[in-house]
Amino acid sequence: MAALQALPLSIDQNAEVSGSQSHTNTRSPVTENTMGSVSSLISGRTYHDKQCKASELSNKCRKPTNMPNCFKQQEGLIKSNYSSQDPLFNGLPTKKPSTTTSGNNGNYVYVNEDFKEEWHEPRVPISPSSDAEDIREERALNGNIRGPPPKLIPVSGKLEKNVEKTLIKPTAFKPVVPKKRNSSLQYLVQRNGGPGLSESQSSLNLLFNGNAAGIPEKHNLLSCRNSTHSGTMSDSGRTSLSSLPTYSTNCSHQMDPVSVSMGHINLDNHTNINGYSDRAPRGRTRPTNSDSGRSSSSKSTGSLSGRGNPSSDSGSCDRSPILSDEILIRELEEKLKDREMELQQLKENLDENEAAICQVYEEKQKRCEQEMEELRQSCALKMKQAAQKAQRLQQVLQLQIFQLQQEKKKLQEDFSQLLQERELLEKRCASFEREQTEFGPRLEETKWEVCQKSGEISLLKQQLKDSQAELAQKSNEILLLRAQVREARSDLQISEEQVQELQDTAHTKTLELEVCENELQRKKNEAELLREKASKLDQEVAGLREAAVANLRHGLCLCHEKEDPFLLYESDEAKAQRQNADNLQGLQQYVERLREALTSERRRYQEQADSFEDERRIWQEEKEKVIRYQKQLQHNYIQMYQQNRELERDIKQLSLELEARELDEFDLHGAEIQFEEITATEI
């Protein structure tokens, strides 16, 4: 629950100022967040003192202040706590300054809020339990349609028991630290920036803003009222107005009803005190519903913040009291008695809710502080982001300015160049005009010459047409010849390719023949070597045969000594035959061994020759591939070169033909134009 806080009525007591002086709207400072008992709410001053104060107020320069509504009291507390240290509150919207007017039919000052509003606008006091942000949202959604104040949301643990049945009363409360019941009295009117009302006194503005039924205003019921009422109010509710003096002071001033936040009793007969009156009120009050929900307090308490009709600051001096003031005093005595009873009942209700309200207030204050800290951080972050964004935008703008300056310089240079070109063109135009004036007579002569040659031109035109037809025919023939030449070139190219291929094959064949001749020569050399080896082997065989024969003979000699007697009787021929057979067998074996070695050598040689032949064949194939690829590339290059040459010749020829046609058309067109002009001049 937010703290209830009111703004006091600060009236400067300067030197004597005339009643017609204009009043300025100022905003009073926020009062201290102090608490007091309910007994401090009742003023202990006499009515005579108040009459003296009222007489002094009219002669001073009054600076009325705004009396804030209940929903502004939370902002007042927050601003008083944070305005000195947080610059973010400078941007919060302030309430409109109040206007102070004095009525034609009264002697009291009415300090009202929003005096510029419509007189029929309803005023709904707002519960102190509602938050300022909730109030703003409700105003934004509902506009001027205002309903009863919202119920208090239970925050502390004490308020969660009977939420549906019982509602917290929007009454003043005192702090946890107890104080005396009879605290020092504080007056409503603060002089020269004195200390403001306590929060307990200012919070009673809600108590007296109960259900008040608006009664139509009766104007000019009383012509004048005196401000010389005196009386006393005590805590026990004893009120007696019988001892009030009825004499008037030297000068009585007309004042509007003052709407004070503590619900101070207004002595004007136009003020609605109990919510109903048989006399004319100063303005319509706003019907409200009390947050406590009690019918006894809501019906008995009235709104003292009503607005009075605007009137001029006019007063009359030395007026005598009238009978209506006495009747009003009696009615006020009865009303004050009822009010004292209500105050006693409110005192009883006050003590019941103080502890819970204090706890709720502390919790809400902590939440408000947290929200303000978050708001400060978010605002600082937004300011930082905005500064960074502004810096980036400044850099971008500087870059754009630099680019625009460069473009401006370029445009200035281009403009200067264009001016120079313009001057040159003007000079040329002037020279052309001079030449035109000079060539005028010559042009007339040339016209007559053109008339003479127009006939020749017509003949030349006919000849030109014939020549163009012949040229078209010749061009067709040329195209046919070109096609034939292209075909012949393609045939020639094909034949050249075939000849080249045949030359390549012949060259390869010659290379193969050379290789074969080399191989044959090598084979011959190898055969000679083999013959030499064979002759050497024959010689060796002959030597071996001789050695074998000698060995056989030596062996035979040795054998004869050991022969049996039977062999001795053999003939010499048989011995010779046997020796020859043995020698032949040995020679045959040796020859077989030599033949085997020769075949192995021949086989090895053949294998080497085959491997050499394979390598030679592979190398030859690769060589032929490379040669064929090179020939193909060379042929392609030659073909492309020839095609490019042909295309260049064709392009040149076509360009010449086009130029010739353009020249012919230009000549024909120019001749026709001149002829028409000449004909027109002759006509």
Curated annotation (Swiss-Prot):
Residues 324-665 form a coiled coil. The gene is lzts2. GO terms for biological process: microtubule severing; mitotic cytokinesis; negative regulation of Wnt signaling pathway; nuclear export; spindle midzone assembly; Wnt signaling pathway. Keywords: Cell cycle, Cell division, Coiled coil, Cytoplasm, Cytoskeleton, Microtubule, Mitosis, Wnt signaling pathway. Residues 290-308 have a biased composition (Low complexity). The lineage of its organism: Eukaryota, Metazoa, Chordata, Craniata, Vertebrata. GO terms for cellular component: centrosome; cytoplasm; microtubule; midbody. InterPro entries: LZTS, LZTS2. This is Leucine zipper putative tumor suppressor 2 homolog. Belongs to the LZTS2 family. It is found in: Cytoplasm; Cytoplasm, Cytoskeleton, Microtubule organizing center, Centrosome. Its main location: cytoplasm. Residues 11-37, 96-107 have a biased composition (Polar residues). Negative regulator of katanin-mediated microtubule severing and release from the centrosome. Required for central spindle formation and the completion of cytokinesis. Negative regulator of the Wnt signaling pathway. Represses beta-catenin-mediated transcriptional activation by promoting the nuclear exclusion of beta-catenin. Residues 1-37, 82-107, 262-320 are annotated as: Disordered.
